[in-house]
Amino acid sequence: MENNRNFPARQFHSLTFFAGLCIGITPVAQALAAEGQTNADDTLVVEASTPSLYAPQQSADPKFSRPVADTTRTMTVISEQVIKDQGATNLTDALKNVPGVGAFFAGENGNSTTGDAIYMRGADTSNSIYIDGIRDIGSVSRDTFNTEQVEVIKGPSGTDYGRSAPTGSINMISKQPRNDSGIDASASIGSAWFRRGTLDVNQVIGDTTAVRLNVMGEKTHDAGRDKVKNERYGVAPSIAFGLGTANRLYLNYLHVTQHNTPDGGIPTIGLPGYSAPSAGTATLNHSGKVDTHNFYGTDSDYDDSTTDTATMRFEHDINDNTTIRNTTRWSRVKQDYLMTAIMGGASNITQPTSDVNSWTWSRTANTKDVSNKILTNQTNLTSTFYTASIGHDVSTGVEFTRETQTNYGVNPVTLPAVNIYHPDSSIHPGGLTRNGANANGQTDTFAIYAFDTLQITRDFELNGGIRLDNYHTEYDSATACGGSGRGAITCPAGVAKGSPVTTVDTAKSGNLVNWKAGALYHLTENGNVYINYAVSQQPPGGNNFALAQSGSGNSANRTDFKPQKANTSEIGTKWQVLDKRLLLTAALFRTDIENEVEQNDDGTYSQYGKKRVEGYEISVAGNITPAWQVIGGYTQQKATIKNGKDVAQDGSSSLPYTPEHAFTLWSQYQATDDISVGAGARYIGSMHKGSDGAVGTPAFTEGYWVADAKLGYRVNRNLDFQLNVYNLFDTDYVASINKSGYRYHPGEPRTFLLTANMHF
């Protein structure tokens, strides 16, 4: 069993490995970079290199003024071409191209996660997802039909975006009108009744105006899971004025609706590490795994959401070297769901007979009825200039943002128990009814920032940046009085049972100072080494707009607590080789997270907890030859508690839901003018599970490999087909597990997707 929990290769100490990697990669990269260069006496031939469609050279965010190859951060840019070739229809699928990033956590106890529940380097990053550099709120699945590229930055992003997760951020870049006309359409069918269509129309009007329309529709069952369905539709019209001139105006709108049947997971009975929760239920130790197709929800389970986003961006080129941009965005994400979760503790199991096939587990109804809104105005100025002999690449700006969240209180839904091995979903508890016991959160933020990259010599650069956020968060919540169970409150005199009673009404204000500094030295024209240090903070309420009263319990959102603080050090090297078609990177990193909440000996709580995530990461992106494209990477990361209570089920100091080893690689080859072949593999190492007192549940998930493949055929310039096969070898694996360990989400089995792409 121990062998299954480790990456199937000999492990090296990370520092030794990285030192060897840097020593080894430098001469190899130098040799590759020199390939095709002429001697001094040879005739010089200037030949432009075609940019790789797998390795965008520049971030679309103006806050990152340097090319990806000269950015002193670990950054992965997933291009639209990669997304299309892999048939990745949502953000979670696209992020499979980034090692160690994924939806590994299935929720707390009786609660389950929904949407893009992303973990990165030991931390929940689902609230650090941005669209065009603006925070996108909501636990929904984000479709890629209107996405130009996805930018993943590892390490603190507080200097770039303000309050954020301590270990990274994700930025989805929207499609914009272009100065050319064309139509791209696709129609897909696949396993589990998968049906999807997209349309991308760009039309030039006159010399400087263009309109673009992106449309999407998708209906599918979840492969390998009975009753689980997904249905979503989207439309994204946009118009641009002044293209090719010094003044440009972009107007964008996005509307997406989703009607899904959520998946609460299946019991972990029979998984490695599972044992019955009591002597009386010992039969479960040898009764075998449940059928992974089983659905433990009800016919009334649903997950509906609506996203509406309107954006206006104006750009003005003051001169050839200076541009000012102003962006205004309003966005609203509404979501409501009823999702069933199962609990398998000793008190949750009913045994009508000795036959385990008659046993039941209790069901819990997870409910949510929430509305998230954001209104922001952001101004950015970028400029390149010299002071004496020192070059400057400056990005500076101000931001005004109001974010609000309303969680509508709903009456509890009671569900009957469910048979462990033969679940029945034909139950109709009804929908949600609001009871007025709402929770309201609002955060107003004013931010100012300035970044500069200083070109000291031709080969040596210094960079730094600072951001000041002034924030004010207000929060109030109510509870329906007279209920029972955890969190119940009695009704005040004269107040009827079930009436909402305010339990929290508080606010918190403060200032956050985040900063970063780095240095880069070009060893050659195509290769560099760099160092970087960054500081990021997350204040109470910064993650979910919820606050807790001063002195009340162990919540990190207490108003008397300090912001969580993360410090990251990184040293790395980046090389553009093979005529700059291929980017190779390697980095060694360490992130220390401070001010974590821990319990004192007297039962009170303080912020003396510390976590650390350290390791190394290597990556590759671009073209090996003009016909051979590749993107991938490998990371080794050790995430531990340095000070405070251990939170892993096995009692170790490891942080849960973080694979120590992770690998991903996708490669595509254009075999002929009309035929292309692609293949990829991913490895997710063993992960520790969190601890919450559950008895007998698995303490870890086993590592696994998954392979995918693609075959493309071009009929003519207007039509091509592609066949994608996912989980080629039909690997059985645990995709995510919840904190208690009573339930998990099985990985998707082997599936097929056939797509017709049309171009006009």
UniProtKB/Swiss-Prot annotation:
It is found in: Cell outer membrane. The keyword Amino-acid biosynthesis does not apply. GO terms for cellular component: cell outer membrane. It comes from the Bacteria. Keywords: Cell outer membrane, Ion transport, Iron, Iron transport, Membrane, Receptor, Signal, TonB box, Transmembrane, Transmembrane beta strand, Transport. Residues 67-175 form the TBDR plug domain. CDD domains: ligand_gated_channel. Residues 1-31 form the signal peptide. Residues 180-760 form the TBDR beta-barrel domain. GO terms for molecular function: siderophore uptake transmembrane transporter activity; signaling receptor activity. A motif (TonB C-terminal box) lies at residues 743-760. It is a multi-pass membrane protein. InterPro entries: Plug_dom, Plug_dom_sf, TonB-dep_rcpt-like, TonB-dep_rcpt_b-brl, TonB_box_CS, TonB_rcpt_b-brl_sf, TonB_sidphr_rcpt. Belongs to the TonB-dependent receptor family. PANTHER family: CATECHOLATE SIDEROPHORE RECEPTOR FIU, FERRICHROME IRON RECEPTOR-RELATED. Involved in the active transport across the outer membrane of iron complexed with catecholate siderophores such as dihydroxybenzoylserine and dihydroxybenzoate. It derives its energy for transport by interacting with the trans-periplasmic membrane protein TonB. Can also transport catechol-substituted cephalosporins. Receptor for microcins M, H47 and E492. This is Catecholate siderophore receptor Fiu. It comes from Escherichia coli O157:H7.
